Amino acid sequence: MDAAATKPHAGGGPSLVGEGSFACVFHPPPRCFTQEHPLSKRSDADKPLGIGKVFERNGDAIEEWAIIKAIAKLDPKQAYFIYPLSQCTVLESAVRTRPNARGCSLLGHSAPNPSREYIMLKMPTARETSVAYVDSHRKRLTIPELLRGMIPVARGLERLARAKIIHHDLKQDNVMWLSAQEGFRLIDFGLAIPMGNAFDPNKNWTLAANYFLHPPEYRMFHQWGRAPRSAALASMEYEEDRHLLAQIAVLPKRTLLDEITSRYLPADQQHAQWTAFHDALASKPTLADARAFAQRYATRIDTYAFGLLLVALAARLSQATAPEGFYRFVGRMISPDPRVRPSPAAVCKWIVASAAKAPRQAPPPPPSNPRRPRHAKQKRP
């Protein structure tokens, strides 16, 4: 880090405090806990300049704890998705944004700094993960109440879809419980990618990661990114490589998790829907056509992971009485055919409507015969 970046800006503005590339950008300068109080013992050896490094800090004005995380380098190749992401109020509403010199935005109390190579995210410290909260309240929590808490997550996914961004890491550890008023909150945008790069192996390395929360159609493209190409094929346009397109015929037709029960989506429907999409994708003459066909439904990639999350959490509840249409709608969310899945806007609308059916807990009634205080007693005449 250069010396100019480590001293306060002119006019007493924000300064960088910390060690090396793990510095925080805040005013007044916060304490960055790197070695003394590590928040998470995670390996950052494979991430340049500590991208993904997690810090714990104290609030600027009030005594509150917040999470600070570097998510991206501000270079022309990696910063193109940051601006629309910052416009989505998926994080807490208290986060303020200011545009920097490159036309992007920085999340947090930061000032323009064109030389900065990363940005910092400020997030509130959560009470529990979604699984921990459901496990601790499993005896009295109902599915409609669970859906009510998921409304902020559904709205966040809808905003991301409008901004043409895929969260790409919607798992149980990234949905945190804040409070009864705020519900669950979606966090961790370290794997977020532009929607247009979803099926491009050169821009989406997670196609080959084979994560369980990724939709089944990813399995049809991940081999193309890893298959070796000869010098003759390398000189051709990758999108027109018919040799790689032919590999689709040998991929399996059943890729859903075994944990998904038949009450959400019967096995025969799983096979029929997967076969229909498989045949539609394999019938495309070129890889470019197949990619364009799958790209039409990229907005529903997060829908699949969100459906898996609802399945996992609902299975942990003791009071598993679901509202009408719950299993049928979630079965559409986890369909192997993205054409069957609802859009994020439809998911948000359905969750809001289903949560409205949950009776809100009324405050406890006052005692029927309250005892009068001693000082209120009156003497007999």
What are these regions (language model features)?
Residues 322-335:
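Conserved C-terminal C-lobe helix
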Residues 153-160:
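Conserved hydrophobic alpha-helix
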